[in-house]
Amino acid sequence: MEMGVPGLKAAQVGVDAEIKALQDGVASIYPNINGTSDVKAEASRFIKAFIDIDIAPEGCVPVTGSMQGTYASFLVCGQCTPGKDTILFIDPGFPVQKQQITVMGYRYESFDVYEYRGEKLRDILEQYLSKGNIAAMIYSNPNNPAWFCLTEEELKIIGDMANKYDTIVIEDLAYFAMDFRKPLGKPFEAPFQATVARYTDNYILQISGSKAFSYAGQRIGVTAISDKLYHRAYPGLTQRYGGGTFGTVYILSLIHI
């Protein structure tokens, strides 16, 4: 599991649907640049069913696994506001994400959340965010490799601090609904997967098919951008791309290329 390979057979419904799609000729055409409409609609519905959060289909972006989703997210976040060029990692997390930051020439800072649980989390976030250089912060919840879950109190603290310092939160949900202390697998019924999205509009969710559906080989995932963030224009993006919003830049200028 630490390597993201549960060793379970891929969900049969996915295998059957993929076979049918190939037989119907999907391999012969390029998908819509914004993402296949059916996939976007079902991703939005999935998020409502299991997280109880409303995100419009336009903000549910199919990606080649969460690896591509986080890479593009880091890249856009670091271009939004001049002076905000650093990503804050709430560790432990996925080491490859730090390598992504290194590849794109950004900076990152990090701290181990083990020493800052509960209200202590607010103090350490204040210490980092008050410097004004943090473009986004990222964490994994449920967490790999430490196998703990952030509490609702801690998620609210992260959301509150994101609002206070206008910082984007990237929530890595690779191990979606794997807090097995709760029955999280019933669609449209509480309890739901915990999320920072209840406490801020400055969020991006990374949802991977690798673990949730044991579909690692196909590298599928969805980056879900909040409605408010999707439609927000940033000075840095306007200067670099001549216009557009966070969401349109993410899709047309990053994912498409």
Set out the residue ranges of the language-model regions:
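Conserved core of the PLP fold type I
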Residues: V26-Y165, I170, F176-T200, I204
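Conserved small/polar residues in nucleotide/adenosyl-binding loops
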Residues: I255-I257
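Short catalytic/ligand-binding loop motif for oxyanion handling, primarily in non-cytosolic enzymes
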Residues: G7-Q12, P145-F148, A177-D179, F213-A216, ...
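Short coil/turn segments
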Residues: N32-G35, Q239-G247
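N-terminal "arm"/small-domain region of PLP-dependent enzymes with the aminotransferase-like
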Residues: M1-P31, A49, T167
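Active-site PLP attachment segment
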Residues: Q193-A233, T245-T248
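Short aromatic-enriched loop/helix-cap "lid" or pocket-rim segments at secondary-structure transitions
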Residues: A11-V15, T102, F180-L184, A216-R219
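Alpha-helical elements of Rossmann-like donor-binding domains used by nucleotide-donor carbohydrate transfer enzymes
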Residues: V13, A17, E42, D123-I124, ...
